[in-house]
Each structure stands twice: as C-alpha cells, then as structure tokens.
Amino acid sequence: MKYTLKMLRASKNWSQVTAAEQIGVSVDTWRNWERKRSFPDVLHIKKIQELFNVAYDDIIFL
C-alpha cells in the first residue's frame, strides 16, 4: 500500500505540529511537505520511515 505523509500522520492521530516535532522540523516545513510544495531530504525521509515503520517505496511524495 502507498501512503501520503498526511495519511501516515493521520494513522497516529497526530496534528501537523506533533508530526513536525517528532521529525524535528518546523510545522511550516511539515505542512509544505504534505502540500507537496517542498520535499524532505534523505535524513528526514529516514526519520519518517522509522517513525511510521514504512518503507521508502511505500511513501508517496508527488
């Protein structure tokens, strides 16, 4: 199954603020990722994979 960042966040019932804090970015950065205005770098992608227990190939960034 493929997941957007919003879907992953919702699976934990987290706000954008909580997700941003858990990843270590500002809420504006997280919001931009969800809206596809910008994309996480490799370090943050690895954190997302670990935090949500999901493979890179299962995350939709486009």
Q: Can you annotate each of these PLM segments?
A:
Residues L43-D58:
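DNA major-groove recognition helix of helix-turn-helix/homeodomain DNA-binding modules
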Residues M1-S11:
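A short, Lys/Arg-rich alpha-helix, primarily the initiator
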Residues R35:
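Short, conserved catalytic or interaction motifs in soluble domains
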Residues N13-N32:
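Short alpha-helical DNA-recognition segment
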Residues A10, E21, E50:
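Alpha-helical residues within the helix-turn-helix
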Residues K6, R31-N32, D41, I60:
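Key DNA-contacting residues within the recognition helix of helix-turn-helix
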